[in-house]
Regions:
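Extended, charged catalytic domains and RNA/DNA-binding interfaces, predominantly
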Residues: 1-176
Length: 176
C-alpha cells in the first residue's frame, strides 16, 4: 500500500545509500520527473535540487532521467476515459496546460540553458532516456490506450554489444 510518509527526499537518500553499497550496482533513471510540473519552471513533485542530491549521493547508480515522456500517443487515442471535459488529451499525459511537453520532451530536458544543460555544465554525467514503455496501444480496437508499440515512436540507442551487461554498461557510460 502507498505510504506518503515514505515519499520524501530523506527516504530516497536512505534508499540510495543502501543501493550504493550493493555488490552489483543497478541503474536508476528518474521516471518522468516533470510530469507533475504546474508551469514552466515550476517543477512539482521532483525539484532540480532533489535530482542533484540523488546524483551526488550515488553517481554510479543515479544516472539520469526519462526526458521524453511516455504515453506519446495520448493525443491520438479514441478512448474517452483519457480525455478532459473539453475532449482533449495531452501529449505524454502531461495534463497541465501551463507545463506542456516541448517538441515531445519535457521542460527539464527541452529548454536550452535549462536543467539538463545546467547538470551537464556542472560536469555531471547525467543522461536522458526516451522510454518506449507500452501499456495499451492507442489503435487497439478493444482497449485503446495512450501508447505506441515499444520503439514505434522514439527509441534510445545504446552503443553496445548484444548482451545485457554491455547495454547496461553503455547506459552507465552515456553511450546513448
Amino acid at each position: 500500500p502507498e505510504d506518503p510518509t515514505r515519499n520524501t527526499s530523506t527516504s530516497a537518500l536512505k534508499a540510495l545509500a543502501f543501493i550504493n553499497n550493493l555488490p552489483r550496482l543497478p541503474l536508476l533513471f528518474a521516471n518522468h520527473p516533470s510530469r507533475s510540473a504546474t508551469a514552466i519552471g515550476a517543477y512539482g513533485l521532483d525539484e532540480p535540487s532533489e535530482l542533484r542530491h540523488y546524483h551526488d549521493a550515488a553517481p554510479n547508480v543515479y544516472h539520469g532521467m526519462e526526458g521524453a515522456p511516455g504515453h506519446q500517443a495520448a493525443t491520438l487515442t479514441t478512448n474517452e476515459n483519457f480525455r478532459n471535459d473539453a475532449g482533449d488529451s495531452h501529449r505524454g499525459y502531461y495534463t497541465n496546460p501551463d507545463a506542456p511537453t516541448l517538441g515531445g520532451f519535457d521542460q527539464m530536458t527541452a529548454i536550452v540553458g535549462g536543467l539538463w544543460d545546467s547538470l551537464l555544465g556542472e560536469g555531471r554525467r547525467f543522461w536522458i532516456l526516451a522510454s518506449s514503455d507500452s501499456h495499451m496501444h492507442y489503435a487497439d480496437p478493444v482497449r485503446p490506450g495512450l501508447d505506441f508499440w515499444p520503439g514505434e515512436f522514439h527509441k534510445t540507442y545504446a552503443w553496445a554489444m548484444p548482451t545485457y551487461n554491455s547495454v547496461l554498461d553503455s547506459l552507465r557510460a552515456g553511450r546513448i
